[in-house]
Amino acid sequence: VTTAVTATSGLVATNLTTAPAAQVAQTQAADPALTLAIDTILADPRFTGSMVSVAVRDANTGEALYERNTGQRLNPASNMKLFTSAAAMDALGPDHRFTTDVLATAPVVGGKVRSDLFLRGGGDPTMLAEDYRDLAAQLKAAGVQRVDGNLVADDSYFDDVPLATAWSWDDEPYYYSAVTSALTVAPDTDYDSGTAIVETSPGSPGAKPTVALQPATDAVTIVNNATTGAAGSANTLSVEREHASDKVFVTGSIPAGASINQEWVTVPDPTTYAADVFARALRAQGITVSGAVREGATPGAAKVLASHDSMALSGLLVPFMKLSNNMHAEALVKTLGAEATGTGSWQAGLAQVRAYAQEKGVDTNVIRISDGSGLSRFDLLTTDAVADLLVAAKQEPWFQAWYDALPIAGNADRFTGGTLRSRMRNTAATDNLHGKTGSMTSVTALSGYVSNADGRELVFSMISNNYLASPRSQEDALGVTLAQWSEADGAAPPTADSRSLRRSTDYGPADIECSWAKAC
C-alpha cells in the first residue's frame, strides 16, 4: 500500500488497487479520538475488497469532523430519496396536494350525463379504492344516475414511460418496482401505489386455496395452481407476476388452518387498474355507464363533477420516507417536471432535482441522478454531496417536517421509526438519530442527523458498495458512536459493539429495505 499526505490539505490518498481492506482517504478530524473510534468501525473485515465512504460534519456550520473517501462516487440506493424529497418540498411546498377529478363536457340533466365521463389523474400515489368510492358517491349525490358515453381514464399529467432508467427487469413483479402513472391505485395505507394484494386462504387438505385480490380488479389475472396441504405442513406458497404479463401465478402449498397469506404484486397498467376500480365504484352506487372503458385526454371544456385531494406533501413524506416508498419518489419527480415545464417526465423532473441540489451548493458535476427513488443502478452520489444537502436543508423553512419524516432510530412505532425502528434500540442513538436508509444487493447506506453527548448537532453519511456480507451493523455502530461522543472529556467515544447490535437487531433482508418485505 502506498500512502501520500499533502501538506496543504492533510488529505491521505491510498493506493486503491492494492489496499487489502476498504480504501482510506481522509482529512484530519477535529477530534483525533473520534477518528480512532470511526476508523475502528471501518476496520471490520466485511469491508475488505469493498468501497466505503463516511462523512461527518457539524450540522450548523458544515465543519468536517471526519472524512473517508468522501469524493468517491457510490450507488446510494434509497439515500437518493433525500434529494428527491428536499427538491419536492422546495418546489411544490409542504402544502401541495394532488388532485384527482371526475369531469364531463355535458351537464347533469334528469340524472343523465350525455357525454363521456373523464377520470383525470393528478399524480396522486395515495389514491385508495375508498377514495374512488368517494368520487362515485359524490357523483351520486350530484344526481348522476347514468352516463351516456364512455368512461375515459386520463393519465396524461405524466408521460407514458412506465419505469425509470436502469431498473432491473427481474424486480418488475415486486411492489417496490411498480409502474409510475398519474392515475393509479394504492391497496393499503402504506400507499403502495401501482400494486394489488393477493390474498390466499387455505381450503381443506388437497383442495385449491381461495385466492382474491384487494382491491377487487380485473387488471391482473390470477392463475391458481396452488393446493392446500395438511395442517401443520410447510408453507411453500409462491405468488409471482409473470414478466411482461398481467398473469399472476399462485403455486405451492398452504397448510390447512393457516392464516390468510398476503403478497403484494405490481400491476402492469395502473391506469387501467384505476379505471376498473372506479367503474366498480360507479356500479356499486347504481350509476350506469353505457359505453366502454378506455384511455384518453380530458377536453379543455370539461367541467368538474367530483374531486379528491390528497393529504398535504408534508404528510405524504411520512409514509414516503419512513417506509422508503419508491413509487412516491417517482411520482414526485414526474410532478416536479409537470409543474415546472408542463411535461411530467423523468427527464424534466430530475432536472429540477439537480437544479435544487446545485442551488444548495452540491457539485452536481460529480454525481449522477437517474431516478427519484434510488432503485436505478445508474445512480451515483458522494457522501460529500449528501452531507452538503443535509447541512443546507437545515436552513429551509420546511426543514422540521422533512426532519420529522426521516426514520428515527430505535422507535418501535412503525410510522415513527420506519426502517430504523428495529435498529440501535436502547442506545444513545435511540429517538435521537434521524436518518435515511438505503439497501440493494451489495449496497447499504445510512445518512442523517444525530446529536452527540454534548448536544452538538451532527450530520453524517455512510455509503458502502461491493461487499459480500452486509456491513449494515457498522452503520449502526457509527450512529451510536456519534451519539456517545463527547468533546468535553477529551476521551475517545466508546466504539459501539457491532456484534451486540447484530444480536439485538432484526435487520430484515440484507438486499432490500426491510419495509419492502413488510419486515418493519
Predicted regions and their residues:
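Short active-site loop at a secondary-structure junction
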Residues: 67-87, 92
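Secretory targeting and sorting signals
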Residues: 1-21
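Residue-level preference for non-acidic, small/hydrophobic
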Residues: 62, 81-88, 151, 183, ...
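A short, well-structured edge-of-sheet supersecondary motif
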Residues: 42-68
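A short glycine/serine-rich beta->alpha loop
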Residues: 69-74, 264, 373-376
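Conserved serine DD-peptidase/penicillin-binding transpeptidase domain
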Residues: 20-30, 36, 40-42, 91-363, ...
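Small-residue-rich helix-loop
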Residues: 65-67, 330-520
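Short beta-strand scaffold segments in enzyme catalytic cores
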Residues: 54-56, 100-102, 447
